[in-house]
Amino acid sequence: MAYIGRRGLLAGAAGAFAAAAAGPARAAESAGAAGRPGSRRKAAAEFRGMWIASVENVDWPSTAGLDAGEQRDELASLFDAAVAHRLNTVFLQVRPTADAMWPAAREPWSQWLTGRQGVDPGWDPLGTAVADAHARGLELHAWFNPYRVANNHTDPARLASSHPARRNPGWTVPYGGKLYYNPGLPEVRAFVQEAMLDAVSRYAVDGVHWDDYFYPYPVAGQYFDDDDAYARHGAGFATRADWRRSNVDTLVREMSERVRSVRPSARFGISPFAVWRNRDRDPLGSDTRSLATYDDLYADTRTWVREGWIDYVVPQVYWHIGHPTADYAKLVPWWAQTVAGTDVDLYIGEALYRCDPGSATAAWRDPAELSRHLTFARRYAEVRGHAYFSAKQVAADPHGAMARVVADHYPTAVPPR
């Protein structure tokens, strides 16, 4: 079966995962928490989260150009849905395409608010969101995308006149009909951290959250042209792939350190595609046959966990129990083993959006499939919660799958701390 995951939903790239399905891996050596000295506030006894995606107006705002009151009311309604379903955390996407859902010092207002990048929406969405979430007893994790610049074009001249990528087009790489910052440039790495930390320093966010976007997902027939950056900065690496992984590792490690410095109470977490490596390529990999973050996205997610660079990981295990090439029942124990012995909390990302009576897959036509996921995951003490993609499915729950999860697993509310 073709896998159309969150990336396909958000970016409209329906063909990119046609051959992909997944599951990750772990080793038994002791983990290093040295990457994050000190201790953060204790995490929830049971994490219950949902993603609110703003890119392409997936969840919120429902459409660009609503007035400030309508936008705020819609966001409040999603927070209310989280509370009604006994969740305790929301991931709000506040930097979807190198633009901002707050009055940012370094980047323009997001196009997904008004329909035009750089236009003031007349309110402060992130500031309001933090206050409104906390008033409801919810944690608010600010969700950032580090490298994505444009989702539907490759021309820096189409960006807002103040956009740093327009002023520095040499920082960008066009690929697959989209525009990205080049992860191989040290100046890019420094800039994107400053852009994100602008929000972290100014708002009482409970977490800093990244998803599965690092180097772009492979597109057939396309070449990610970082030749010049590799020539200038790739000395000392055996392969370009090793250099690319080092670029992403450095960003994760540095951001981890800086979040701790700027806002010690905030947790830093990442929600990667759920396959680190396949076992046929690495004995530490998962029993899967899929695209893999290590080999295809240059994201060494296992190292981030084992080195303690992140506080939590939310692998997007977006397949059903029994999937032939990426079985939920194989991926969850792999991740449980990966975090074992570390201080990294494991939450499982759940594909609520795939629960659909019209699905071609029988498992997803069954509203009890998601509940079975939680039942299965409870076998593993390392699994400390779940997060659901995405908010509009939590709120509408057209198939009753979320209601079943709540009835079977969330009899009472659990505070976030």
Describe the role of every protein-language-model region:
Residues A2-Y3, R7-A27:
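N-terminal export signals
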Residues A45-G49, L87-R95, P125-T172, H209-D211, ...:
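Glycine-rich, aromatic-flanked loop segments that form ligand/cofactor-binding clefts
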Residues N57-D67, Y147-D198, D296:
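Active-site-adjacent "subsite" loops/lids of carbohydrate-active enzymes
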Residues D73-A98:
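Catalytic domains of carbohydrate-active enzymes, especially glycoside hydrolases
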Residues W102-T114, R148-Y175, Y213-A235, D282-R289:
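Aromatic- and acidic-residue-enriched segments that line the glycan-binding/catalytic groove
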Residues R202, G207, P216-P272, W276-R279, ...:
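Active-site neighborhood of glycoside hydrolase catalytic domains
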Residues R244-L251, A266-P333, S359-T375:
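Extracellular glycoside hydrolase catalytic/binding regions
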Residues Y312-G322, T342, L346-P416:
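Substrate-binding cleft of secreted/luminal carbohydrate-active enzymes
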